[in-house]
């Protein structure tokens, strides 16, 4: 085990605070509509330009081990806010820096760190209660567009695209963001359920121009196993032919004699049929097939359930108004499933999302939920250069999360105003002793930091702006740094999602309290001879130091 370097008390906190300041100062220049860009060096390719706080925070690694510990803990604030609400990362970082700075001063002055922490916790509870009380539910499409615009640093086009996407796929629908191949940003909406498996054979194609299978009012056979022979299926196929309706087979695979027979029947026109492989793998495949069955009002044919193919009749097949299959995707529109069954399945998936601890599983469950509940919207972000597209895509991602958060918990006046107003509620907060009172005061001062920083980034005097906002009693009164005017923030469309503001202050206070109550820090000592011995001469490469 290598030797360690240990720092205590004031020295430890000072080194840690330096790291906090370096990271927070790099992140906070991006705050607000007049926030600046940060350029990130990449080991290959062009540098990346961004105004996304968490992206900047994730790039920062410091040489000094103790400073780096402070920086990494504040980075955690940004990451946690990004995970919980998808936005508010810069606000959370600014708040954490303000609380740590004031807290470190108080500890150096001899106050009890644990009482300070209790005071901070009391203050945060009161602030969150005030935010929730003043939160306003999102009712119109315009408000969703406004939230998106603010989060995308004032880009109204992004706000409009997001509002359209949410209108089309609903609040549960999935919105994915991709890079476009052109200059224009565009929105593409897929209604119904889509999964990433195409036709097994191009001979199933019905629309040769688009190389696509299009079937109206189709039956859907959902089978968990491979189909190699059609003997078991013959009674069912004959029944389908008599109805005159097309059939889509979803199975693990269709091969050999079974595939050849289906293709021949399709080409002769006796049976309108197409086959696709089942989506997913293992248990996820079973779950997705069950989703398709519920959506289309059919049954997933599985030996686990004791159902054999020869016993399948028409009533066990799913139905859909339209099925479209291209080389890579299958889309089922207007499945014939019962509404109550679909709602029960949606509730079940939501419960699984709440319980899962894996981000990957959560993402996959949310995709399944969207396919059942709404649909899928794809925003393709365009731009003149790769650097511009990447920067814009970052902003669209932020805005997308912010609009979801707004729909979930409502909205508050933006521009740091909601936190400023909440700070007024802390003046009369009762505490058990002076140190706890100081903890409350630390949070009260910190709550003005985001509004102050937004003004500073716009080239204004932060303290003057904060003072003028607090002079007015009106809750939504604030400073529009884009125009330099004092306005009603809500009616001007400068709004923040409640969830974003709430998670920002909670995460900032949580990590800042830990930093304030730190009394010792332990880091590895750098190795004295890190280079290692030189290689012996040989092959013309002697003396090279690895």
From Swiss-Prot:
Location of the protein in the cell: Cytoplasm
Positions contributing to ATP binding: 30-33, 51, 87-91, 415, 496
Taxonomic superkingdom: Bacteria
Alphabetic keyword roster: ATP-binding, Chaperone, Cytoplasm, Isomerase, Nucleotide-binding
InterPro entries assigned: Chaperonin_Cpn60_CS (IPR018370), Cpn60/GroEL (IPR001844), Cpn60/GroEL/TCP-1 (IPR002423), GroEL-like_apical_dom_sf (IPR027409), GROEL-like_equatorial_sf (IPR027413), TCP-1-like_intermed_sf (IPR027410)
Catalytic activities: ATP + H2O + a folded polypeptide = ADP + phosphate + an unfolded polypeptide
Molecular function terms, GO-annotated: ATP binding; ATP-dependent protein folding chaperone; isomerase activity; unfolded protein binding
Pfam families attached to this UniProt entry: Cpn60_TCP1
Example of a GO cellular component annotation carried by this entry: cytoplasm
Function: Together with its co-chaperonin GroES, plays an essential role in assisting protein folding. The GroEL-GroES system forms a nano-cage that allows encapsulation of the non-native substrate proteins and provides a physical environment optimized to promote and accelerate protein folding.
Family affiliation: Belongs to the chaperonin (HSP60) family.
Subunit relationships: Forms a cylinder of 14 subunits composed of two heptameric rings stacked back-to-back. Interacts with the co-chaperonin GroES.
Entry protein name: Chaperonin GroEL 4
The species this protein was found in: Bradyrhizobium sp. (strain BTAi1 / ATCC BAA-1182)
């Amino acid at each position: 085990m290598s030797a360690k370097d240990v720092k205590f008390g004031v020295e430890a906190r000072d080194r840690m605070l330096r790291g906090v300041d370096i990271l927070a100062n790099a992140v906070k220049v991006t705050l607000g509509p007049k926030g600046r860009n940060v350029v990130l060096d990449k080991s290959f390719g062009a540098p990346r330009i961004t105004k996304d706080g968490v992206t900047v925070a994730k790039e920062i690694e410091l040489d000094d081990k103790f400073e780096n510990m402070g920086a990494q803990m504040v980075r955690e604030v940004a990451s946690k806010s990004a995970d919980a609400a998808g936005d508010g990362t810069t606000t959370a970082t600014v708040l954490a820096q303000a609380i740590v700075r004031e807290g470190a001063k108080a500890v150096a002055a001899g106050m009890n760190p644990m009482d300070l922490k209790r005071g901070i916790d009391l203050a945060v509870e009161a602030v969150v209660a005030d935010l929730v009380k003043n939160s306003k539910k999102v009712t119109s499409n315009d408000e969703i567009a406004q939230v998106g615009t603010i989060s995308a640093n004032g880009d109204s086009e992004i706000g409009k695209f997001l509002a359209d996407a949410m209108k089309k796929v609903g609040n549960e629908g999935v919105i994915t963001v991709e890079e476009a191949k052109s200059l224009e940003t565009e929105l593409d909406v897929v209604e119904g359920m889509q999964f990433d498996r195409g036709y097994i054979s191009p001979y199933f194609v019905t629309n040769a121009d688009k190389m696509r299978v299009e079937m109206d009012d189709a039956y859907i056979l959902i089978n968990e196993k491979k189909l190699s022979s059609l003997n078991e299926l013959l009674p069912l196929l004959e029944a389908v032919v008599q109805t005159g309706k097309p059939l889509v087979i979803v199975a693990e695979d269709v091969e050999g004699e079974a595939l050849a027979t289906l293709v021949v029947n399709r080409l002769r026109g006796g049976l309108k049929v197409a086959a696709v492989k089942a989506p997913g793998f293992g248990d996820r495949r079973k779950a997705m097939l069950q989703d398709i069955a519920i959506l289309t009002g059919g049954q997933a044919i599985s030996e686990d359930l004791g159902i054999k193919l020869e016993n399948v009749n028409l009533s066990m097949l799913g139905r859909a108004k339209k099925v479209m299959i291209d080389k890579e995707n299958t889309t089922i529109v207007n499945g014939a499933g019962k509404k109550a069954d679909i709602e029960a399945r949606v509730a079940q998936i939501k419960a699984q999302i709440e319980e899962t601890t894996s981000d990957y599983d959560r993402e996959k469950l949310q995709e399944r939920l969207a396919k059942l509940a709404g649909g899928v919207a794809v925003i393709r972000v365009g731009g003149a250069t790769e650097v511009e597209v990447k920067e814009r895509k970052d902003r669209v991602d932020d805005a997308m999360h912010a609009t979801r958060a707004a729909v979930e918990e409502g909205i508050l006046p933006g521009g740091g105003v909601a936190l400023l107003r909440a700070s007024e509620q802390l003046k009369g907060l009762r505490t058990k002793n002076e140190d706890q009172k100081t903890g409350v005061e630390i949070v009260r001062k910190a709550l003005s930091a985001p509004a102050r920083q937004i003004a500073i980034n716009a080239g204004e005097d932060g303290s003057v702006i904060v003072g003028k906002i607090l002079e007015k009693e009106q809750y939504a009164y604030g400073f529009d740094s884009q125009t330099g005017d004092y306005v009603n923030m809500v009616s001007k469309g400068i709004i923040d999602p409640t969830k974003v503001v709430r998670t920002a202050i909670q995460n900032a206070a949580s990590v800042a309290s830990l930093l304030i109550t730190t009394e010792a820090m332990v880091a590895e000592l750098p190795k004295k001879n890190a280079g290692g011995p030189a290689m012996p001469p040989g092959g013309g490469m002697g003396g090279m130091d690895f």
